[in-house]
Amino acid sequence: MHRLNIFLEHIYEAAQQRGTTFESMLSEARKMGYTGLECDLWRLSDCVNVRNLFESCGLNVASIYSMYDFLRDTPEKSLDGMKRHLETAAYFGAEKVLAIPGFFQPGDDREAGFAKFAEQ
């Protein structure tokens, strides 16, 4: 079965550009053939209402992505975030998760950063 996914952020942006509601844009995306949503974790904080809305439009969560700052966050904070990420994916039935490991900032010691990342 082939699935056609769209980033949830694109739905929000299209709704804003067209001056329409988020809900109507979700419905329009479904009419255009999209079946799945690629979602940023922070957009799914109101799990029950969001899942009900997606389901009412005939859409499902295909994947959930989130940014992690493995270089600056404690391992405990990263693990807590990842646990929430996986729990949310399970709740929505998402088959894929993507952990984005953050970015180096200007002035960061890249070699030390890679070494710290390798330790974790």
Give, region by region, the residue ranges found by the protein language model:
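Short linear capping/connector segments at secondary-structure termini
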Residues: G102-Q105
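N-terminal pre-domain/capping segments
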Residues: M1-A94, A112
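Active-site cleft segment of glycoside hydrolase catalytic domains centered on the general acid/base Glu
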Residues: G107-Q120
